[in-house]
Amino acid sequence: MSGDASTSAQDQNVESNDVPAIPDVDAGTPIDPVVEETPTLDTEIDPANRLQQLEQELNSLKQEHEAVQSQYMRIAADFDNFRKRQARDQDDLRQQLVCSTLTEILPVVDNFERARQQLNPEGEEAQALHRSYQGLYKQLVDVLKQQGVARMEVVGQEFDPTLHEAVLREENQEHAEDIVCEELQRGYHRDGRVLRHAMVKVSMGPGPESSSDAASEQPQEGDA
């Protein structure tokens, strides 16, 4: 009997040690709620620093925009120059083809002019034939005029190697030195472009005899 009593006492002591003690709380005492602390940033953002950062970003974007715009303007200018150059080259090529074709026609005009100067048709039939090919010559000249082809007026003009081809040079009493005194073959131009140089005879000025004769004709100092 005494053994059972001691065992019961030990069990009660163990149970009492396992259960934590609960403090006495009065019914009227309020219990403080548990408040969780919110973590805060160690450093707050400074408005001035943020404004400076935005200004730097804006300046960077402006520089990028200016660089892209400058590149675009260069490309646009290069393309415009390329387009103009292509148009100019095409126009030059077209003008060269037209001038080349017109130059091939000029010998035909020369033949018509030689025939008109050398032939003296006699008889009604010959005159009718003469009028017929002269009509063709007039049509050909009119076509050349419509294409802007014009004859050069060279006699009495100063010799210009860009317009004239000097075939002969001789002394001439009527023209000074380096003046065209005779046209041997007509020259033609079109819109400032030479189709064919004029073959000319250029004056070398009065000869030495003419100069001495002119000097002898002047009154001497003793003559009066």
From Swiss-Prot:
Keyword Cell inner membrane: no
Lineage top rank: taxon: Bacteria
Keyword Cytoplasm appears in the UniProt entry: yes
Gene Ontology CC terms, in alphabetical order: cytoplasm
UniProt-listed Gene3D superfamilies: 3.90.20.20, Head domain of nucleotide exchange factor GrpE
Region entry Disordered, spans: 1-35, 203-224
Family, as annotated: Belongs to the GrpE family.
Function, in words: Participates actively in the response to hyperosmotic and heat shock by preventing the aggregation of stress-denatured proteins, in association with DnaK and GrpE. It is the nucleotide exchange factor for DnaK and may function as a thermosensor. Unfolded proteins bind initially to DnaJ; upon interaction with the DnaJ-bound protein, DnaK hydrolyzes its bound ATP, resulting in the formation of a stable complex. GrpE releases ADP from DnaK; ATP binding to DnaK triggers the release of the substrate protein, thus completing the reaction cycle.
Protein name stated in the entry: Protein GrpE
Origin species: Synechococcus sp. (strain CC9902)
